[in-house]
Design a protein with these regions (language model features):
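C-terminal regulatory/interaction module of P-loop NTP-utilizing enzymes
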Residues: 1-150
């Protein structure tokens, strides 16, 4: 069940076992071992994704292994194509696969998650992604809520 699902009735919950598995370990992702990226590139992607999971965790806006797999796959394809450099591919992958999940009301948790995400993206020199999060922060302040899709 996720935020798009209606809540379950007490009758159903009486018969169910609820297991939460939303908190993932980025380091444990099995795809790191099979990636075609260079070791330094893998380290940069892993550090970026670990930082994003940690920044987004308090607001439960983080992501799972499928997103990690897709980010790696996007960068690998970009490397094969030779059209864009690694840093641009990482920025585009984060923008396309992680940032669309960002949304929320103007609460301390969401403010902190957006601030930490913004700081990380600037530190990692992911300019397009950092600019998008800055827009979301502006929306949060001025509108009381923010979402990737405007």
């Amino acid at each position: 069940m996720d935020e798009t699902t209606h809540g379950l009735s007490d009758k159903v919950l009486d018969r169910a076992a609820v297991i939460e598995f939303w908190d993932i370990d980025v380091e444990a992702f099995p795809g790191w071992k099979t990636s075609a990226l260079a070791e330094a590139q893998i380290a940069r992607v892993r550090d970026t994704l670990k930082g994003l999971v940690n920044a987004l965790r308090p607001a439960r806006l983080h992501f799972g292994w499928r997103t990690i797999h897709d980010v790696i796959g996007y960068i690998e394809q970009a490397e094969r194509g030779g059209v864009i450099d690694f840093d641009s591919a990482l920025d585009q992958a984060i923008y396309a696969k992680v940032l669309p999940k960002l949304r929320g009301e103007d609460t301390p948790r969401v403010q902190a998650a957006f601030a930490d995400t913004s700081s990380l993206l600037r530190d990692m020199r992911l300019a397009d992604s950092a600019a998008k999060v800055a827009e979301l922060q502006d929306d949060l302040r001025s509108l009381g809520s923010a979402r990737f899709w405007r």
